[in-house]
């Protein structure tokens, strides 16, 4: 009967498991650094790898508009107007004109009225821009929209 050693037993008892000297298979120093070390702009160690697998890793690409030029509109939802009604009235942002309550979004520094939430009062809304959904809800509450 042939008794064959299992492959699992290979290299048992060997100090180095085929790596020669113990130092050769020790830390990151034998591999050119750990992970992606050495792939920086000086492009020495792993440059061939970088060119093949990560060509966009270094250098700039695209364009970013300066923050000063970017326009992000200031917005307010209908539910915010409804919840802070008294606060706006005290501040003079909501005032009475010809027997109607007027909400002046331009005085608040808001550019756009959004349609999230409900409006429970009839308001005349002055704004630079009102979304169609918001306009629909304002009119349903008995108010009107005036674009500034």
From Swiss-Prot:
What role does this protein play?
Binds to the 23S rRNA.
Please list the GO biological process terms of this entry: translation
Coiled-coil blocks: none
Give a GO molecular function annotation for the protein: rRNA binding
Family, per entry: Belongs to the universal ribosomal protein uL15 family.
Q: What gene does the UniProt entry assign to this protein?
A: rpl15
Indicate the quaternary assembly.
Answer: Part of the 50S ribosomal subunit.
Q: Which UniProt keywords apply?
A: Ribonucleoprotein, Ribosomal protein, RNA-binding, rRNA-binding
What domain of life is recorded for the organism?
Archaea
Which residue ranges have biased composition labelled Basic residues?
Answer: 1-28
Q: Where is this region: Disordered?
A: 1-43
- A Pfam family cross-referenced in the UniProt record is Ribosomal_L27A
- Fetch the PANTHER family from UniProt: 60S RIBOSOMAL PROTEIN L27A (PTHR11721), LARGE RIBOSOMAL SUBUNIT PROTEIN UL15 (PTHR11721:SF3)
* Name of the molecule in the record: Large ribosomal subunit protein uL15
| Extent of Gly residues compositional bias | 29-38
Q: Which organism is it from?
A: Thermococcus kodakarensis (strain ATCC BAA-918 / JCM 12380 / KOD1) (Pyrococcus kodakaraensis (strain KOD1))
Q: What's in the GO CC field? A: cytosolic large ribosomal subunit
């Amino acid at each position: 009967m042939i008794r064959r050693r299992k492959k699992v037993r290979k290299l048992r008892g060997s100090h180095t498991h085929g790596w020669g000297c113990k130092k050769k298979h020790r830390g990151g120093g034998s591999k050119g650094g750990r992970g992606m070390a050495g792939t920086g702009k000086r492009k020495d160690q792993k440059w061939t790898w970088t060119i093949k697998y990560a060509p966009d890793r270094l250098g700039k690409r695209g364009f970013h508009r300066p923050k000063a030029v970017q326009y992000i509109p200031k917005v307010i939802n209908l539910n915010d107007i409804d919840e802070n009604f008294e606060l706006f009235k005290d501040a003079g942002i909501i005032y009475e004109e010809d027997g109607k309550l007027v909400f002046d979004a331009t005085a608040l520094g808001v550019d756009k009225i959004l349609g999230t939430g409900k409006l429970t009062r009839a308001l005349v809304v002055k704004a630079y821009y009102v979304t169609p959904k918001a306009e629909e809800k304002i009119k349903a509450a008995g108010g009107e929209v005036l674009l500034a």
